[in-house]
Amino acid sequence: MCPFFSFLAPLLERLLAIHSLNRIYAEVRQRLVDLEQDPAFFMKTLQVMGTSVEIDQQSFERIPRTRPLIVIANHPFGGIDGVSLGALLSMVRPDSRLLGNFLLSRMDGIRGNIIKVDPFQREGSAQANFAGMREAIRWLKRGACLGVFPSGEVSSFHFRSLSVADPVWSSHIVSLALRTKATILPLYFEGNNGLLFHLAGLVHPSLRTLLLPREFSKMEKKTLRIRIGRPLSPELLSLMGDHPVTTDYLRLQTYALAKSAPGKIPLRQIKLPFWATQTGKDLSKTAPPQKKEVMSAEIAGLPASAQLLVYGNFEVYCAHVNNAPSNP
């Protein structure tokens, strides 16, 4: 081995916090009761790190305890958010798994807790992901729970929106929910990775990836805050259909949970993703105005599942034309 590399390697390990990651994993591994699948793997990781998760009790009770469930979330940290999601779901849904990077399956204790996918778009990735989706369908059809980060990669800084947000979400989540008649539950992680992480990503995405262990270890003895939204029923998703706008709606429902106080959303946290602000799109025409009394009566007659979003004085509904004849 080159003497210079022998000198440099320990410095790089400390700079990238590889030594901290190895220390955490070694201690977690000592606590495992099953090297293939330890149901408490995620919880034990949080305990070793001294990391706590803060959730509002009322919203915690919204998590459905039975039937097929897909929990979707933003991915601001690229590590600790996955561990926290796994720990949260294991508390209320012993039948839960995460849709995760196949590289994680090399770690003891976690293999049986994830359904493997390959996010690297290399030769063989499509076949691996097809197998992963088939396994996810079988899992959900058993009435189980699946945690998913629809972006498939960590949030990053976008110049167009001048904000940190997930990249474009995969539309496969909608297809998965429709095929399995699963409920979807949006969940929002507060916070972001550090400035150095995002500056490195502007130079090259690989530099951002190299800093993920550093960001993970920085969460030791920290508190992670999670906001949980309202469950979205299979009936509502079926009404909306398998369209890109449905994926956009799921993303909006997730990021709308970012509000820091009732009735207020910090503008820097809820900006639209950069691809949604591009010009040149053909926008649907707005329906002509209708009589207020007629619309009020029709809205009052809609089922509760037709309500998509409530924010301040605004309410958004989705209804079949048969239930809203005055709005063709």
Task: Locate predicted features.
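Membrane-anchoring hydrophobic helices of lipid-metabolizing enzymes
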Residues: 1-72, 82-84, 91-93, 111-112, ...
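Short, flexible loop segments at the rims of nucleotide/cofactor-binding pockets, characterized by
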Residues: 14, 46-51, 122-127, 162-163
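Structural motif
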Residues: 70-72, 116, 147-149
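Gly/Ser/Thr-rich loops at beta-strand to alpha-helix junctions
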Residues: 75-79, 154-155
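Short amphipathic alpha-helical face segments that pack within enzyme cores
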Residues: 80-87, 172-175
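Glycine-rich, phosphate-binding/catalytic loops in enzymes
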Residues: 87-90, 164-166
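Conserved nucleotide-cofactor-binding alpha/beta core module
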Residues: 90, 94-129, 133-136, 140
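Non-catalytic C-terminal accessory region of glycerolipid acyltransferases
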Residues: 130-318
